Amino acid sequence: MTRYIFVTGGVVSSLGKGIASASLAAILEARGLKVTMLKLDPYINVDPGTMSPFQHGEVFVTHDGAETDLDLGHYERFIRTTMTQNNNFTTGRVYEHVLRKERRGDYLGATIQVIPHITDEIKRRIIKGAGDADVAMVEIGGTVGDIESQPFLEAIRQLRFEVGAKRAMLMHLTLVPYIATAGETKTKPTQHSVKELRSIGLQPDVLVCRSDHPIDISSRRKIAQFTNVEERAVIALEDADTIYKIPGILHSQGLDDFVVERFGLQCNGADLSEWEAVVDAKLNPEHEVTIAMVGKYMELLDAYKSLIEAMSHAGISNRTKVNLRYIDSEDIENQGTALLEGVDAILVPGGFGLRGVEGKITAVQYARENKVPYLGICLGMQVAVIEFARNVLGWKDANSTEFDSKSGHPVVGLITEWEDATGAVETRTEASDLGGTMRLGAQDCLLEQGSLVHDCYGKDVIVERHRHRYEVNNNLLPQIKEAGLKISGRSGDGALVEVVEAPDHPWFVACQFHPEFTSTPRDGHPLFSGFVKAALTQHQKKA
């Protein structure tokens, strides 16, 4: 039977519930347990697919094509379990389902209420998402006390009661601030946060106390006394210089032992040698490179969370410190390519909309003409094709129909038809809704032997995740290929361009898929590893 660990946060948001939860999950997995994780988001959007990156940050795409919260990226980077659409749901998704059932008459004329109908649906989804895992970590988004979170908190209160104390526990993250003028940490915010939880019938079993200063034994003892939490279950989690230290920090305080004993689980001790190796490689690099990341959402770097982590993973696998120089593509439009001088490689990630696109195209031209290693992802591939068409073929009006519907040379256009992972044909038009209508999830990609991308993967067929609605225009592809642009990857049915490479260039690869979604700290990712190797070669050439 599955055991549940419900995770809540108090005092302030952004305490790192996702990282802490994933770190505990990683330790339990290292003990031989099957672990899965769920994220419950209290906003009314059905999913984050149409939300602004400036508000929500990254949209993480699962293997089965769900557009989800970025915390699911943390989950997959810390544990081996592959997340699905069942691992993340929102208030909007729950209400949508309940209202659809009401319209069908499934409730037989009953008055639909938050309790029991909404809470029952939340519980049903939690149980379904947990599947047959030994332990399911269930993270509740937001902060205790928020109105939006109340249905979720009531649902976990009910579920905790229904399955019993031997199968459910509550882990609460809280802030223990350090007051510089007093020279001490303060426990009162934590006491009040737990008081708020207890007022709705939830008593924490574990407190994870976040702080930027050490929390001494006396403070932990005081917290335990005033919150009715065992002293051994009051965990001090100070800021760390890398998030991959967190599993070791939690393990050193016996959190996994407490969980295993509480649930009565029989399992091995934790083998954290893989995490120790990751931390060692991260903190003791032998080389260093600087890579320019040219994007349009630089005001909120969480918009590129998986990509930034993937570059870190590539550094780990190459024993190389990767310094990312974050450059807003609009700054290139205004200030020119001087911003790119001195870098060892250039990375252009995905994005939507016209703003900043010309700056990205200029960055591609700089990389291609100056033989600087280049990796383009999603829009980064599309702008690479546009740049090549403009400056090599001489099609000065070349563009994507996303940015200029009247372009004389629309080298990138809307995908109107494609096969999904099951072989079913999906169609789209300009009139289709924005939400949930992209080419999403894992798709086969056929690689050309002898290409740079094939050298990276060492395979003829790969599977990578997608999130896009525009593609290279096959009608103009013959001229583009004749001019020298190499098509080194195609979709499984051969219909869509997946990877392009520039001719006469040491390392220029652009892909339509999002490889960052499958990169992990322990295994890295072959494409990012190859990119960092190319940057290192470039750096050594300049030395």
Swiss-Prot record:
What residues does ATP bind to? S14, L15, G16, K17, G18, I19, D71
Please tell me where CTP binds in this chain: S13, D146, I147, E148, K186, T187, K188, P189, T190, Q191, K222
Which Pfam families does the record associate with it?
A: CTP_synth_N (PF06418), GATase (PF00117)
What influences the activity of this protein, per its activity regulation comment?
A: Allosterically activated by GTP, when glutamine is the substrate; GTP has no effect on the reaction when ammonia is the substrate. The allosteric effector GTP functions by stabilizing the protein conformation that binds the tetrahedral intermediate(s) formed during glutamine hydrolysis. Inhibited by the product CTP, via allosteric rather than competitive inhibition.
The family database entries (InterPro entries) matched by this protein are listed as: Class_I_gatase-like (IPR029062), CTP_synthase (IPR004468), CTP_synthase_N (IPR017456), GATASE (IPR017926), GATase1_CTP_Synthase (IPR033828), P-loop_NTPase (IPR027417)
Binding residues for UTP: S13, K186, T187, K188, P189, T190, Q191, K222
Q: In which pathway does it act?
A: Pyrimidine metabolism; CTP biosynthesis via de novo pathway; CTP from UDP: step 2/2
Q: Which EC class does it fall in?
A: ligase
> Can you state which reaction this protein catalyses?
UTP + L-glutamine + ATP + H2O = CTP + L-glutamate + ADP + phosphate + 2 H(+); L-glutamine + H2O = L-glutamate + NH4(+); UTP + NH4(+) + ATP = CTP + ADP + phosphate + 2 H(+)
Give the positions the UniProt entry annotates as the active site.
Answer: C378 (nucleophile), H514, E516
Its GO CC terms? cytosol
- Detail the disulphide connectivity of this chain as listed in its UniProt entry: none
A GO molecular function annotation here is: glutaminase activity
What does the entry list as the binding residues for L-glutamine? Answer: G351, L379, G380, M381, Q382, E402, R469
Region span, Amidoligase domain: 1-265
The entry describes its oligomerization and partners as: Homotetramer.
Q: What else does UniProt say about it?
A: CTPSs have evolved a hybrid strategy for distinguishing between UTP and CTP. The overlapping regions of the product feedback inhibitory and substrate sites recognize a common feature in both compounds, the triphosphate moiety. To differentiate isosteric substrate and product pyrimidine rings, an additional pocket far from the expected kinase/ligase catalytic site, specifically recognizes the cytosine and ribose portions of the product inhibitor.
Name the job this protein performs: Catalyzes the ATP-dependent amination of UTP to CTP with either L-glutamine or ammonia as the source of nitrogen. Regulates intracellular CTP levels through interactions with the four ribonucleotide triphosphates.
Concerning its family, UniProt says: Belongs to the CTP synthase family.
- The protein's name is CTP synthase
List the source organism.
Pseudomonas fluorescens (strain SBW25)
